[in-house]
Regions:
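Sec-dependent bacterial lipoprotein signal peptides
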Residues: 1-21
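Bacterial Sec signal peptide processing site at the extreme N-terminus
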Residues: 15-37
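Extended amphipathic alpha-helical heptad-repeat regions
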Residues: 30-236, 240
């Protein structure tokens, strides 16, 4: 029986490639005729441009979130190295006590320190796994945000053509409205697919976060303060 590959194990770049073939170059409308439109006739174009600006702002935020996720993962990898060093030190100290025929009370404390160090390693591993998934989520969110910008560009061109045609501007006659409408539809479909992929990845990250928290609660009293806060995988809302 063929095993299915979990979605979270697929790099975000591969997920993006699986979604159609990427954005096509935006179709441009000869908008020289827009100068003939009055304020009311230009309103749909202005509205589309405002939405495009919001999409571009959302893409900037998504890129910043991706950088934050990468930074948290880098810190987590360092914490794992520290936890490994602590375990090695605890094991060495316990071995030394055994060679010195130390008192049972000292050996018991050494055993407890070894177990605590092992718990810290398990917690560090689960934290790293969670943050690796959150990097994938951030990459998927960035891909979806970029697709939203592509959709916004297509809608701006569509609004220009419709506004000029409604005003009987000659420049509108040379444009292919069918191609522009098709470009909008393709952009919207691709954006929806990328948003679904991001949501699926986030669902996997929630499970990883919960597992990490269950282990981390046992070692939290021994752990040092977090050098960088690690938030839960809250769902991001699509830009409006």
């Amino acid at each position: 029986m063929r095993m299915r590959t979990p979605l979270w194990s697929i790099p975000a770049c591969a997920l993006a490639l699986s979604c159609a073939s990427g954005p096509k170059p935006a179709l441009k409308v000869d908008d020289s005729g827009l100068s003939r439109l009055d304020e009311t006739q230009m309103q749909p174009v202005d509205d589309a441009r405002i939405e495009l600006g919001r999409a571009q702002d959302a893409l900037s935020r998504a890129r910043a979130n991706e950088a934050d996720a990468q930074a948290r993962l880098t810190v987590a990898k360092t914490e794992r190295e520290v936890a490994d060093a602590q375990l090695k030190r605890a094991l060495a100290e316990r071995d030394l006590l055994k060679k010195q025929y130390a008192a049972q009370e000292q050996l018991t404390r050494a055993d407890e320190e070894v177990r605590a160090a092992q718990d810290r390693i398990r917690a560090a591993d689960m934290k790293r796994q969670y943050l690796e998934r959150m990097v994938q989520v951030a990459q998927a969110d960035r891909n979806a945000a970029a697709a939203h910008v592509d959709t916004g560009n297509a809608l701006v061109e569509q609004s220009k053509l419709r506004a000029m045609r409604a005003a009987d501007v000659p420049q509108a006659e040379s444009a292919n409205s069918g191609a522009i409408d098709s470009r909008v539809a393709e952009s919207q479909v691709r954006e929806a697919q990328l948003r679904k992929q991001a949501a699926d990845l986030r669902a996997g990250a929630v499970d990883a976060y919960n597992k990490w928290q269950q282990v981390d609660v046992r070692v939290r009293t021994l752990a040092r303060p977090e050098p960088m806060p690690v938030p839960p995988p809250n769902e991001t809302q699509p830009p409006r």
